[in-house]
Amino acid sequence: YTLLILASVYYLMNNRTWMGMWFYGAAFAVKLQTLFIFPFLVILWVRKKVDLKHFITIPVMYFVGILPAWIAGRPFKELIGIYAFQGGKDRWSLSIKFPNIYQIIGNNFFLDEYVKAGMLLILGILMLVMCYMAYQKVRITKEFVILLVVFFGMLTTYFIPHMHERYLYLTDAFLLIYTLIRVRRFPLFVTASFLTVVGYGQYLTKQAPLVSYGALAFIQLALLVLISLDVYRYLHDPANVLEGGTLESDRIESERTEGRAGL
């Protein structure tokens, strides 16, 4: 599913919106965790890089994905709700070898209360962040798209309950791309990879890591803060502000870019 997301972002960055959204829909049909970075599509929609009609690809590709199982005899109602069923399987822990906020506050107590509070918290944070970004009239460059994927991938997984150690795989892939653009940020990728390897190591060796997950969660928080600062700097860099500061000027700039690319 990471390969599908990479293809999706590639086509979206090159203004081939339908192709990009078909790949995103295919990724969603494969893996629910595709939703971790869904807010970046909302930002592209606000900036008129994606239209509402393009989002039809998500349910269409999901239906295509469940069609073989339906034909084979599995109940359609069960197939439609399979992601909801999967989301309720890990109720025994708030964080499964994942360095996020629940490793700091304790991931084995008040499970139901923290799950509800955590979901409300991340929804509130995402709404505030997306509203703030929507009012910033900046150019949607390829670098910014990559940065958005990394940012939302880190943000959502840090606050959503029941995260597994493998759920940062997608973010790590895009973080590598981002650090190849911003070489001075390469230590962030090295650090993020270390955190991922710690979780994998415990799974493979069945032994607890030498460093507590609480300490690792603070390191992950530091990475999130640094990436957030990169987003803030981009939004407030005068070089990235649109001429006229309107969505219309963003559309004109996009048309110019498409014209130069021959799309």
PLM regions: where:
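Aromatic/glycine/proline-enriched transmembrane-helix motif characteristic
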Residues: A84-Y158, Y232-L235, G245
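Perimembrane helix-loop-helix junctions
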Residues: F36-V60, I71
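Aromatic-rich transmembrane-lumenal/periplasmic boundary elements in polytopic membrane proteins
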Residues: H54-N100, I104
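Multi-pass, polyprenyl lipid-linked donor-dependent membrane glycosyltransferases
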Residues: Y1-L6, V30, Y167-L168
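Membrane-interface alpha helices of multi-pass inner-membrane proteins
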Residues: A7-Y11, W18-I43, F151-F159
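Aromatic-anchored segments of alpha-helical transmembrane domains
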Residues: Y62-P68, F151-F159, T191-T205
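Specific aromatic-rich, kink-prone transmembrane helix
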Residues: Y1-T17, F174-L175
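Aromatic-enriched
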Residues: R185-I252, L263
